[in-house]
Amino acid sequence: MSGSQTLVVKLGTSVLTGGSRRLNRAHIVELVRQCAQQHAAGHRIVIVTSGAIAAGREHLGYPELPATIATKQLLAAVGQSRLIQLWEQLFSIYGIHVGQMLLTRADMEDRERFLNARDTMRALLDNNIVPVINENDAVATAEIKVGDNDNLSALAAILADADKLLLLTDQAGLFTADPRNNPDAELIREVTGINDALRSIAGDSVSGLGTGGMSTKLQAADVACRAGIDVVIAAGSKPGVIGDVIADISVGTRFHALDTPLESRKHWIFGAPPAGEITVDDGALSAILERGSSLLPKGIRTVEGNFSRGEVIRVRSLAGRDVAHAVTRYNSDALRLIAGHHSQQIAEILGYEYGPVAIHRDDMIIN
């Protein structure tokens, strides 16, 4: 790929600490140098940084605290300011300004908030400012869980309209088996599609400070590739790794973007976590998959969760297959009332209607 590129670089806690209990500043200095070099060459760089909790623990002198959500939030609140201060200090050596964006998955659930975040991201990039993004761990609750910053980096790549997403980790890439305990494990260089076989060989990282593993990196790669973004998983310790990815030099494991990526509007649908789910019968399933039809209330069997009109929900088959992510035209209570009924009965049952379909085909992404 020639010309100016937009690259999102995700740095996990294991990369930032080198497996220790404190931030490895020498290594972070080197990564900033690589980013600054590419920035000077005209490329747009976005940083997705982990490490707030580790930075907070270090700043407080490694206190003995209970392993609770509240403790993680406390450490994140203390560490986040230390972390952004470090990024700001190091990038300033090269005359580069940074802009902090603290996000949660909730910022991706609402269309307006998604667009606002996208506008902020693009404004920073247009003004040659490096966005530094992290999960807002100090206020997030359910979001503090395995894989948040992996998945967050894929969503950041969508917000930035990135060309590539680089997931830096403590492993050289994705292997055929866990290289820590299998000497015959081989590095997988190229991936053109993520399937169940690939997911089954993804192992978890050994770091006790972070929240990510290889399986969540596959999830992130899947989201980004479907949005038309190439993804590379590589070792953060490899010299010149950021420049290699920009230059398309083979490094780590590369996941190729789909030839027919999701349209811009559907990026948000695919990235948003489902607020609930519905199960459809075989007739509706066939209409959706084979004819590209909208979903009518008649084909709905069950409704799970409580969600509002306009939220993203999951569509499942009777066999339990995850069929699609979609924006619902009706809330969960309304869907329970009209499920199994003909479209002509909607107004009679509800006293109002938003049209004859429960989900329009343009608001649906088939998995």
Swiss-Prot record:
Domain PUA: 275-353
Record carries keyword Ribonucleoprotein: no
InterPro entries, per database record: AceGlu_kinase-like_sf, Asp/Glu/Uridylate_kinase, G5K_ProB, Glu/AcGlu_kinase, Glu_5kinase, Glu_5kinase/COase_Synthase, Glutamate_5-kinase_CS, PUA
GO biological process, one term: L-proline biosynthetic process
Catalysed reaction equations from the record: L-glutamate + ATP = L-glutamyl 5-phosphate + ADP
Statement: the UniProt record of this protein carries the keyword Cytoplasm: yes
Database matches in CDD domains: AAK_G5K_ProB, PUA_G5K
Protein name: Glutamate 5-kinase
Organism of derivation: Pectobacterium atrosepticum (strain SCRI 1043 / ATCC BAA-672) (Erwinia carotovora subsp. atroseptica)
Lineage, opening ranks: Bacteria, Pseudomonadati, Pseudomonadota, Gammaproteobacteria, Enterobacterales
